Curated annotation (Swiss-Prot):
Keywords, alphabetical: Glycoprotein, Glycosyltransferase, Membrane, Transferase, Transmembrane, Transmembrane helix
UniProt subcellular location: Membrane
Gene behind this protein: stmC
Stated name of the protein: UDP-glycosyltransferase stmC
Effect of residue 83 to L: Does not affect the catalytic activity and does not lead to the ability to perform O-glycosylation
Catalytic activity: stromemycin aglycone + UDP-alpha-D-glucose = stromemycin + UDP + H(+); exophillate aglycone + UDP-alpha-D-glucose = exophillate + UDP + H(+)
Length: 535
């Protein structure tokens, strides 16, 4: 086939890769893959052993590859215990965060080795890789095998496309998301916090460097501008607006066109229909709540119910049994409030005002008109679903990007952010009442504003598919064949030229030096001559 007779948009094989990430990481990637499949592309999925279930509901996935071992139950519990203990305000808490990240990245050697074997086989080699940000071995595969890559991020990548008006480490700030309303002292504290984080991550950096050295690879410094496609599952309105290079695009919220409905047998429909102001509570499927936090949450909800701000609670809680078996939780108060709540009755679903469910159809609940509020850990999916369905949020983030999402929701005027470690039952009840009563109407106004923005942006998942095709088709003709097999003939069309220049050339520093010299030298000579002549 000649170039002139070639297809304009040929079908290709796309490999989606999700390793240590879970449903929240896989769902948006598979939704984009669904769109690509409707355009004629073949979709395959690579994951850890035991995570095949993430792709099995999707008939368009033609093949599943296992590229690593599963995480054991003990490892899983240990990991999320580390996350729960992490705290940016203490040195030990910051180290805990990077120990958890180090644990995630300990899968890199195995996934890199297995992905390398996979793509080395001509039968399995994909034409494009769409990966979760935690599957960072895919970046090495891209560099080694010249397979174009897109990486999915739940928020703007921390070290890419920095802006001077965004203080500290973006996504990990102490207080302010931008410098607009930050005092000079607060901006200084944000920069000092960066130094604290860098000091805390030194073991993590050495761990990565040694791990890569053992695999025969050098260090991979994070780029200020990517040389692969970056798909950010967020949107400006939550994220601070900033200029982005062409290879970085916001595509969120990536939402499936349909979602599970409430089963008639669950009693949820009757529960919601018989009430007008129900709060939905969910902290994700992996967060383990300590007993003291459960007591304060129940006390706060009980106070809000007693005040009439809400008339029902639906709590999605995968496994309340460890708390139920904790006699202290069941029989005593938290020592702060005077609540006499029967925790045992609540946890056993014997309080008719509060429904605890092992699994709940989250989007169906958020979409119901009786749901007036969401008490959330602010995971990536939960944040987007709350905004998309127009439900205000009491944010109680636990770790990672949840902390930034809590700040973003509050900054957008659609929620109140609370600290998971020092909140009180009274404070929780007051914040619930403040949002539900909405005396000045600003919460409702901002919720509707952001919902409309999110709805408009939710169509950008098709733009993500467009951009993947664009980069894929560009890449396969940028590299030579025949005698020039694998030789890069030209750079990717979306990469700005300054990414391939030295800092001196890109900033025109050499040009400025020459211009200054052209002016300074004649002036200097003239001054010297004038001194000689008039001496």
């Amino acid at each position: 086939m000649t170039i002139l007779s070639a297809e304009r948009a040929p079908s290709r094989k796309i490999l989606a890769v999700v390793t240590v990430g879970r449903y929240t990481c896989a769902a948006p990637i598979l939704e984009i893959c669904r769109i690509l499949h409707t355009r004629g592309h073949t979709i395959e999925f690579a994951c850890l052993d035991g995570h095949q279930r993430l792709a099995t509901p999707h008939a368009f996935v033609s093949k599943i590859h296992v590229v690593g071992r599963n995480m054991s139950v003990e490892e899983d519990k240990s990991l999320y215990r580390l996350f729960d203990e992490s705290d940016a305000s203490t040195a030990q808490g910051r180290k805990g965060t990077f120990r958890a990240l180090q644990f995630f990245h300990s899968w890199w050697p195995e996934t890199y080795r297995n992905l390398k074997a996979l793509v080395s086989n001509p039968e399995h080699r994909p034409d494009f890789i769409l990966a979760d940000l935690l599957a960072d071995a895919c970046i090495d595969i891209m560099n080694e095998f010249h397979i174009p890559l897109a990486v999915h991020y739940p928020q703007m990548p921390i070290q890419m496309a920095p802006q001077k008006y965004i203080p500290g480490m973006p996504g990990a700030q102490l207080k302010h998301l931008s410098s607009e309303h930050a005092s000079l002292w607060e901006r200084l504290m944000e920069e000092y916090h960066v130094l604290q984080l860098l000091f805390a991550m030194k073991d993590y950096i050495f761990f990565q460097r040694n791990m890569r050295r053992e695999a025969g690879l050098g260090p991979r410094p994070p780029p200020r501008k990517p040389d692969y496609l970056v798909l950010v599952n967020s949107f400006f309105g939550l994220e601070v607006p900033k200029d982005l290079p062409p290879l970085m695009i916001p595509i969120g919220p990536v939402m499936a066109d349909s979602f599970p409905l409430m089963e008639p047998s669950s009693g949820l429909v009757e529960f919601l229909e018989s009430r007008k102001q129900v709060i939905y509570v969910a902290f994700g499927s992996h967060v383990e709540l300590p007993g003291w936090r459960v007591r304060r949450l129940i006390d706060g909800l009980d106070q809000a119910l007693a005040a009439g701000d809400i008339d029902g609670v639906i709590w999605a809680w995968k496994n309340p049994m460890p708390i139920l078996e904790d006699s202290e939780t069941s029989t005593t108060t938290d020592g702060i409030s005077d609540s006499k709540t029967d925790y045992n009755a609540v946890l056993r679903n014997q309080d008719e005002r509060i429904r605890i469910m092992h699994w709940a159809p989250q989007r169906a609940i958020l979409a119901h008109p009786s749901t007036c509020l969401y008490l959330s850990h602010c995971g990536a999916s939960s944040t987007m679903e709350a905004v998309y369905h127009g439900v205000p949020v009491v944010a109680m983030p636990i770790y990672g990007d949840q902390l930034a999402n809590g700040k973003r929701l509050e900054a957008a005027g659609v929620g109140i952010n609370m600290n998971r470690n020092n909140f009180t039952a009274e404070g929780l009840a007051q914040n619930i009442g403040r949002i539900v009563r909405d005396d000045d109407g600003l919460f409702a106004r901002n919720v509707l504003r952001l919902q409309r923005i999110a709805t408009a942006n939710s169509r950008r998942k098709h733009v993500a598919a467009d951009r993947i095709e664009e980069v894929m088709y560009d890449s396969e003709l940028r590299f030579g064949d025949g005698s020039k097999q694998g030789v890069e003939l030209r750079p990717t069309h979306l990469q700005t030229p300054d990414s391939r220049m030295s800092w001196v050339r890109a900033s025109n520093l050499d040009l400025y030096i020459v211009c200054i010299a052209f002016v300074a030298v004649p002036v200097g000579v003239a001054r010297w001559l004038s001194k000689v002549w008039f001496a």
